[in-house]
């Protein structure tokens, strides 16, 4: 019996030394905590790290994919999204459930289109939940990471070691993590304390996760404390700061204007006078009467200059429609101005539909069940129900835009 106790103590010490992981609640407290939330010492499903799931992402989805759209859930279970029913979560990163939504429609006579679900986002591999590698791209677009290696911990540090110290330094050691640093109500750490970085994302100083990519940038951002919510009455404003596009370039370097020889859309560059003026004036197609004081659109967010000042970022993160100001000329376009991080209802994980001329017709979102004789047309509905189209915009009212609204590229470019 004494020998068994010694073995058990050694195993526990080994787990703690390796930093093996945590529950979802503990993760969102800022860093590593309850190891047994993800690991099973005697009856694991994965031999490599004694994981509770067959693989890393399956282990994550055990907590982040349960029924009910709330808080940290980012995967809607299959049973909750049958044909015609959209994924339920409205987190800023999007719901991975969109990867399972394939749409087939005929935009015109003799023309059939199939829009595969795996075109809607990052195809994490989570065998226990039926998520498989990208069926088209063998490597990350604009990069060389093996698509079969993509998992939640390719981007997130499942042990949450990266932290923000009291002097603002980002490090993997130096003080204990006392809480999350992701939210607009997150307190600044006192001397001898630290808070977790945004969403436990890997960054400068982190080790590589699945896929072997090492990040050299820090993803600075702040989100409202309530963020998985409908935007029917007020937007969810995430305050994005320095490092966003450089962080994405870790895997997608050839998609970025600063690291590619191709003709690509600028990122991590100031909007400048003309684009900032367009954004602030643009309300909808044909309506350029807006002002900077009320022009913010959560479907087309921007990076707040190049700041990593969390006092500034916290003041901008909002879900009450109180902070409505649009960009200054020094604010920046970033990857997440056009894309979400996980998945969306549209191809290439864009925030709005770029595969059609109009996103709103006859004053409503189009859909196969639309009451509008125009909105029901296949070239506008594109195989989706009204509920699916609306949810892809986080329930933002169609009336927020023009009755015949063109692509939201026009929020910056005003060509309509």
Which residues does each predicted region cover?
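A motif-centric signal for short, conserved binding hotspots located
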Residues: 25-416
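Bacterial N-terminal signal peptides that target proteins for export
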Residues: 1-11
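C-terminal segment of classical bacterial N-terminal signal peptides
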Residues: 14-24
């Amino acid at each position: 019996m004494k020998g068994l106790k010694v073995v058990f103590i050694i195993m526990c010490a080994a787990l703690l030394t390796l930093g093996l992981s945590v529950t979802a609640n503990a993760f969102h407290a800022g860093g590593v905590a309850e190891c047994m939330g993800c690991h099973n010492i005697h009856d694991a499903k994965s031999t490599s790290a004694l994981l509770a799931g067959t693989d890393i992402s399956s282990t994550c989805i055990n907590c982040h994919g349960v029924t009910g759209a709330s808080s940290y859930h980012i995967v809607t279970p299959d049973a909750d999204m049958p044909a015609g029913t959209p994924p339920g979560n409205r987190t800023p990163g999007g719901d991975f459930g969109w990867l399972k939504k394939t749409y087939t429609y005929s935009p015109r006579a003799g023309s059939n289109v199939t829009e595969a679900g795996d075109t809607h986002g990052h195809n994490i591999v989570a065998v226990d939940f039926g998520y498989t590698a990208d069926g088209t791209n063998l490597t990350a677009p604009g990069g060389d990471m093996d698509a079969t290696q993509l998992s939640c911990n390719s981007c997130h540090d499942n042990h949450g070691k990266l932290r923000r110290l009291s002097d603002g330094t980002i490090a993997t050691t130096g003080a204990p993590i006392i809480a999350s640093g992701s939210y607009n109500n997150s307190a600044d750490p006192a001397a001898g304390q630290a808070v977790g970085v945004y969403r436990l994302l890997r960054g400068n100083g982190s080790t590589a996760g699945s896929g072997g990519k090492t990040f050299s940038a820090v993803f600075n951002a702040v989100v409202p404390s309530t963020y998985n919510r409908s935007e029917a009455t007020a937007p969810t404003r995430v305050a994005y700061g320095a490092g966003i596009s450089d962080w994405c370039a870790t895997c997608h370097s050839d998609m970025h204007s600063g690291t590619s020889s191709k003709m690509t859309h600028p990122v991590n560059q100031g909007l400048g006078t003309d684009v900032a003026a367009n954004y602030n004036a643009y309300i909808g197609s044909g309506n350029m009467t807006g002002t900077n004081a009320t022009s913010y659109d959560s479907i087309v967010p921007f990076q707040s200059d190049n700041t990593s000042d969390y006092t500034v970022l916290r003041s901008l993160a909002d879900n009450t429609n109180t902070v409505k100001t649009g960009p200054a000329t020094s604010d920046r376009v970033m990857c997440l101005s056009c894309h979400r991080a996980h998945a969306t209802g549209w191809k290439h994980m864009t925030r709005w539909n770029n595969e059609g001329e109009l996103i709103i017709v006859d004053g409503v979102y189009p859909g196969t069940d639309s009451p509008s004789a125009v909105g029901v047309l296949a070239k506008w509905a594109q195989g989706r129900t009204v509920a699916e189209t609306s949810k892809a915009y986080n329930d933002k009212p169609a009336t927020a835009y023009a009755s015949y609204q063109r692509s939201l590229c026009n929020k910056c470019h005003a060509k309509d």
